[in-house]
UniProtKB/Swiss-Prot annotation:
NCBIfam families: PRK13670.1. This is tRNA(Met) cytidine acetate ligase. Pfam families: HIGH_NTase1. GO terms for biological process: tRNA modification. Catalyzes the formation of N(4)-acetylcytidine (ac(4)C) at the wobble position of elongator tRNA(Met), using acetate and ATP as substrates. First activates an acetate ion to form acetyladenylate (Ac-AMP) and then transfers the acetyl group to tRNA to form ac(4)C34. One of its GO terms (cellular component) is cytoplasm. GO terms for molecular function: ATP binding; ligase activity, forming carbon-nitrogen bonds; tRNA binding. Gene3D superfamilies: HUPs (3.40.50.620). The keyword ATP-binding applies.
Length: 365
């Protein structure tokens, strides 16, 4: 049987995600971000709610990406997620993308020329942002052009790099309907961005979300809910360079900007430069919010939920892979658990995220 991996945020889960799961074959394993997203923002609803949405709509097993995999630039996000899925025995990776492209060929190219390609990136001027460097590399070696806003395509290339040299086949699914950042309401499939923006529009949600009741019952948060705490973390820390990935230049810019910024968005605008993209700045602010330090990734994989089919697969992995299904006195990953505690500060109604929580079980699919 095919074992298909899917790397996702489901922020929130919508019909486009359901379409992706419907297109996937065999046993479907989702490696999902926890409570903070790849582009450096809190999830609109918590990880347990999003895992349940996925399990109700075709996923067989949902595992959590640790915080320091979840909140990373595309390449590190892709690498960390593929590492986890590889250990869970996937033989194919399904993903949505805006481009029609032979990603397998790109993975093969990277297998062959990876060292040369990385050397090319290293030699590019530092005035370029990391995404610009990566795009220059793909243009040079694979002849790829980057048109407009295609974040899923950028992630797909990161997945192609991550599966290089592994026995995992890539299966791109053409993205349906609205683009990633689109807020258009007149489409067959709405984007997660549009759903976040129109979260109070009942008809809109019902049209584009399969598990709408779960979404409506859940506590919702936005970045601004954490701004007072972020402000405190910046002002009270005498040396921001002790925080993960924050360099001297960024530390100075952030300290200066916080004097006048009245919101997270304003802070991001003030700190962003040509070299430091908005997504990168948001990630740095997320690290500051957590007081994140460089730390090792957990050995074990945290299971958020499964169907009967998923449970059988976990059983078959016993003894080969270290799995955590209940977090007790011993932490699974201290950094992720700290992030969860801070996430809960966004709204008093958010449920406990770790202690006493056990995987969600869905009997039928």
């Amino acid at each position: 049987m095919t074992i298909t991996g899917i790397i996702a945020e489901f922020n929130p889960f919508h019909n486009g995600h359901k379409y992706l799961l419907d297109q996937a074959e065999g046993l479907k394993i989702v490696a999902m971000s926890g409570n903070f997203m790849q582009r450096g923002e809190p999830a609109i609803v918590d990880k347990w709610t999003r895992a349940q949405m996925a399990l109700e709509n075709g996923a067989d097993l949902v595992v959590e990406l640790p915080f320091l995999v979840s909140v990373q630039a595309a390449d590190f996000f892709g690498q960390g997620a593929v590492d986890i899925l590889d250990r869970l025995g996937i033989d194919s990776l399904v993903f949505g993308t805006e481009e029609v492209l032979d990603y397998q060929k790109i993975a093969d190219l990277y297998t062959e020329k990876g060292a040369e390609m990385e050397k090319f990136v290293k030699n590019l001027p530092d005035s370029l942002s990391y995404p610009q460097k990566t795009q220059a590399m793909w243009k040079e070696f694979a002849g790829l052009d980057f048109s407009g806003n295609t974040p899923n395509h950028v992630l797909a290339l990161a997945y192609a790099k991550a599966v290089a040299g592994r026995n995992i086949k890539l299966h791109p699914i053409q993205r349906q309907g609205a683009g990633y950042h689109s807020v258009n309401k007149d489409v067959d499939f709405a984007s997660a961005t549009a759903l976040r923006q129109h979260q109070k529009d009942q008809d809109f949600l019902e049209r584009f979300m399969p598990s709408v009741a779960l979404f409506e019952q859940a506590s919702k948060v936005i970045w601004e809910d954490y701004f007072p705490l972020l402000r405190y973390q910046i002002l009270s820390n005498p040396d921001l360079t002790t925080i993960y990935q924050v360099n001297q230049e960024m530390a100075v810019r952030i300290k200066e900007a916080i004097k006048t910024a009245q919101s997270v968005e304003e802070l991001v605008e003030l700190v962003t430069t040509k070299r430091y993209t908005k997504a990168r700045v948001r990630r740095l602010l997320t690290y500051i919010l957590m007081q994140a330090r460089e730390s090792d990734l957990p050995e074990a994989i945290h299971v958020l939920g499964f169907t009967e089919k998923g449970r059988q697969h976990l059983k078959s992995l016993k003894g080969q892979v270290s799995l955590v299904s209940r977090i007790g006195k011993e932490p699974w990953d201290a950094m992720t658990q700290k992030a969860d505690q801070i996430y809960q500060l966004g709204k008093p109604s958010i449920a406990e995220q770790n202690f006493g929580r056990v995987p969600i079980r869905i009997e039928t699919n």
